A protein has these predicted regions:
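Scaffold/interface architecture of coatomer-like assemblies
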Residues: 1-332
């Protein structure tokens, strides 16, 4: 009788390398964060709302809010300033606005300063030192070029901010006029929609000069030999409103320099006192599509919430939140 060959040894299970994490394949639908500002018509933050008072709709479909809190925290912001050989008064306005913003900063805020003309210039990387911010602004003395390539500068800024986690803000001090950017309006709008957790607060400069020229019918140029009409500025104003609306910010158009401290006080209040909502979308597709958002403030019965003051009178309020976001796209 022939001997049976010995049974093969049992297959050893692969050994787990120490320190290496276990992996599993799953579809992870990222949380969508929505910062919401609810204020009275006078700009006062309404701080008494609860989680159940908020209703979030994505493409018209109600979402379940999983995370909710009220924040009063330090900010991470970029001060993006137009500084070019345009009009002397525009430059003065831009500097006054920039210093007003610097004055509004608090101890633990992180701020970077970028100026732009033909191209962006990083004057100060992110810092918590106010003196560094003032030092960066003190460099703005003699502008180099007449061009104001706003779209290129804003795109570059958003590209840098996209690498930073958490909520970020762009304080955009500008006339809003773009002269010769390589990018067009559609491209910068697409970039704004695709950049997560960024809110833009445009602050217009040069309004007094514009108003004077409209009244006295004087011609003016945006820089040396770059003719600009009132229609160009009106279009710029509309674009700044759009940048703010898309990201949940607000655009400001001061008529006088004396308004600037109050404007930056308002912006500081807006970005330090917000409701932070988060949800996992009912649409799990990671297809890179743009999803429209709508935030409502409701009562227990689902109807619009009525807010009353201490005297029992109805208070009109406004809700500020971004209009949408771009879903992640799976890597093929």
């Amino acid at each position: 009788k022939k001997e049976e060959p010995p049974a093969p040894p049992p297959v050893e299970k692969p050994k787990k390398i120490e320190g290496m994490p276990d992996y599993s394949i799953r579809v992870d639908v990222p949380l969508v964060n929505v910062d919401v500002l609810v204020t009275t018509k006078d700009g006062q933050f309404i701080s008494t709302l609860k989680k159940d008072n908020f209703k979030v709709l994505e493409d018209g479909v109600p979402q379940t809010i999983s995370n909710f809190n009220v924040s009063e925290a330090p900010i991470t912001a970029v001060l993006l300033v137009e500084f070019a050989s345009t009009n002397y008064y525009f430059m003065v306005d831009a500097l006054n606005a920039s210093y007003s913003f610097a004055n509004s900063l608090k101890k633990n805020d992180w701020v970077a300063v970028i100026s732009y003309d033909m191209r962006p210039h990083i004057l100060a990387d992110f810092t918590q030192d106010k003196r560094t911010v003032y030092g960066a602004l003190n460099q703005l003395r003699i502008p180099g070029f007449a061009e104001t390539n706003l779209f290129d500068a804003l795109y570059d800024t958003l590209d840098r901010l996209d690498q930073i986690e958490g909520r970020k803000y762009v304080i955009l001090v500008t006339t809003g006029v773009d002269t010769f950017s390589k990018l067009n309006l559609d491209q910068i709008m697409k970039k704004i929609r695709a950049t997560k957790d960024v809110t833009i607060f445009p602050v217009s400069v040069g309004f007094a000069v514009r108003e004077y020229c409209e009244t006295h019918r004087c011609g003016y140029t945006h820089g040396i030999g770059i003719p600009v009409s009132n229609i160009d500025y009106l279009q710029a104003d509309n674009e700044m409103n759009t940048f703010a609306r898309l990201t949940g910010g607000r655009a400001y158009f001061p008529r006088f320099q004396g308004e600037l401290p109050e404007i930056f006080h308002d912006i500081s209040g807006d970005i330090r006192n917000q409701y932070n909502l988060a949800y996992r979308p009912t649409n799990p597709k990671l297809d890179g599509s743009y999803r429209k958002l709508k935030v409502e403030v409701v009562g227990p019965d689902g109807s619009p919430l009525k807010v009353r003051d201490q005297k029992g009178k109805d208070v009109k309020y406004q809700i500020v939140a971004r209009e949408g976001y771009t879903a992640k796209h799976t890597v093929e």
